[in-house]
UniProtKB/Swiss-Prot annotation:
Transmembrane segments: none
Gene: pccB
Name of protein: Propionyl-CoA carboxylase beta chain
Gene Ontology MF, one: ATP binding
Chain segments carrying region Disordered: 439-476
Pfam families: Carboxyl_trans (PF01039)
Family of this protein: Belongs to the AccD/PCCB family.
Listed InterPro entries: AccD/PCCB (IPR051047), AcCoA_carboxyl_beta (IPR034733), ClpP/crotonase-like_dom_sf (IPR029045), COA_CT_C (IPR011763), COA_CT_N (IPR011762)
Stretches assigned to the CoA carboxyltransferase C-terminal domain: 226-476
UniProt keyword annotations, A-Z: ATP-binding, Ligase, Nucleotide-binding
Region annotated Carboxyltransferase, chain positions: 1-476
PROSITE patterns the UniProt entry points to: COA_CT_CTER, COA_CT_NTER
SUPFAM superfamilies documented for this protein: ClpP/crotonase (SSF52096)
Length: 476
């Protein structure tokens, strides 16, 4: 491996697409070291530090043929990935490429394929983060998609075939932003995890993720013993009212320099479930939370989103905190046709496979198949805590009574039916639902008093052995 001397800002071009300038903006000041001589390959790779973490990065050189990927450029990419694997360093890719170089023909396609193979070899071994700063078209679209986290700057465009090809083949009229811009990939396709405000923010978010994934820290028992605010005070008084779970997630996690440590991933995609990294008592954790503001039901997209995040955390030894308030799987013909059974099974598989410590907190209710899917003890949860008065059942009491006592309700006089239904529902809940019964059956631990939540969560996570799994992180 050829390592050249560190470069200074004055040596880099003033072109905003200049790869050296972009790499310098990613790395800690004065730590950028190119891994090869600058050439016309359309790629520049370098090593450097991110918050002190040794990191490998590569950047498309959009000043040369629009960053198109040729044989030589792909060799640089493969070498950079191999170096990161050998050093067990994270790797960050800055993408601004029009795809394979047409002039190099099939050889270029073969070279791009070798890049993909190297990325898959690195999967699950080292964190791979992609930052899309411009076009990532054709073959270059699949590069970011094979990595663990994809961040898009406002100018980012990801598509396999551009608007002209789409128009000529299908007759559809579409512009580049609608086809492959950040809104499309954070809200519709789920390809991107984060939409940044600008290029500087995109690089900042990449740095933050490298720090959290590679410098995970340890639980600070002193911080845990201080407890936290009464999270239940943030819940609505009525059990029927929706609420946004994200403020509760933020409150569970640390603030770092006055800023919440929570970095949400895919926040605008499959919004009934929230996923992201944060720090809890100084330790990096992954958080998965049902969001009642968006119905809170599991569906095909949210189950798949959560499953991928569970496997990402498991691959890199990140403990999980699962915040549960879910009425079950969303029913409907469209859900069945969209593959809720197949895609929902991915979440079951991911949790059952996971070896990292993982704690579940039931805040209000958990019914039906979601009872199992949301990190149940049956799937290997380290501990499951339930707040007082939370409901745990096959289904809600009122719905269950409508089935179990259908004949009695039908036979009741009209003016008495509603009162009978309410009485039967209360009896059913006392017998079959509620946290107390689950605790007696040792499926759950009893609810905590205000301020004790964090102590129990931290203790359960800190005491459990953390075994980092060795599996690939396939983009589910």
């Amino acid at each position: 491996m050829t390592i050249l001397a560190p470069v200074t800002k004055s040596e880099s071009s003033t072109d905003p697409r200049d790869p050296l300038a972009r790499l310098e903006n990613l790395f800690d000041p004065g730590t950028t070291v190119p891994l090869h001589a600058r050439d016309k390959s359309g790629v520049l790779a370098a090593s450097g530090n991110i918050d002190g973490v040794r990191t490998i990065a590569y950047c498309s050189d959009a000043t040369v043929m629009g960053g198109a990927m040729g044989v030589d450029g792909c060799k640089h990419l493969v070498k950079a990935i191999d170096t990161a694997i050998e050093e067990e360093s994270p790797i960050v890719g800055l993408w601004h490429s029009g795809g394979a170089r047409l002039a190099e023909g099939v050889e270029a396609l073969h070279a791009v394929g070798l890049v993909f193979e190297a990325m898959v070899r690195a999967s699950g071994l080292i964190p791979q983060i992609s930052v899309v700063l411009g076009f990532a078209a054709g073959g270059a679209a699949y590069g970011p998609a094979l990595t663990d986290v994809v961040i898009m700057a406002p100018e980012g465009r990801v598509f396999v075939t551009g608007p002209d090809v789409v128009r000529s083949v299908t007759g559809e009229q579409v512009d580049m932003v609608s086809l492959g811009g950040p809104d499309t990939h954070t809200k519709k396709s789920g390809v991107a995890h984060i939409a940044a405000h600008d290029e500087a923010d995109a690089l900042h978010r990449a740095r933050r993720l490298v720090s959290m994934m590679c410098e995970q820290g340890e639980f600070d028992q002193r911080a845990a013993e201080l407890g936290d605010s009464d999270l239940r005070a943030m819940m609505p008084a009525s059990a029927k009212r929706a609420y946004d779970v994200r403020p509760i997630v933020h409150e569970m996690l640390d603030n770092v320099e006055g800023e919440s440590s929570f970095e949400e991933l895919q926040g605008n995609y499959a919004r009934s479930i929230v996923t992201g990294f944060g720090r809890m008592a100084g330790r990096t954790v992954g958080v998965i939370a049902n969001n009642p503001l968006r119905l809170g039901c599991l569906n095909s997209e949210s189950a798949e989103k959560a499953a991928r995040f569970v496997r990402l955390c498991n691959a890199f030894g990140v403990p999980l905190v699962v915040v549960v308030d879910v009425p079950g799987y969303l029913p409907g013909v469209s859900m069945e046709w969209e593959g809720v059974v197949r895609r929902g099974a991915k979440l079951l598989h991911a949790f059952a496979e996971a070896t990292v410590p993982r704690v579940t907190v039931v805040t209000r209710k958990i019914y039906g198949g979601a009872y199992i899917a949301m990190n149940s003890r049956a799937l290997g949860a380290t501990a499951v805590f339930a707040w007082p008065n939370s409901e745990v059942a096959v289904m809600g009491a009122k719905a269950a009574v409508g089935i179990l006592h259908k004949r009695a309700l039908a036979a009741a006089p009209d003016d008495e039916r509603e009162a009978l239904h309410d009485r039967l529902a209360a009896e059913h809940e006392a017998i079959a639902g509620g946290v107390d019964r689950r605790c007696r059956n040792r499926r759950r631990r009893r609810g905590n008093r205000p301020g004790e939540d964090s102590q129990h969560r931290h203790a359960a996570l800190a005491s459990a052995p953390s075994v980092r799994a060795r599996h690939k992180n396939i983009p589910l």
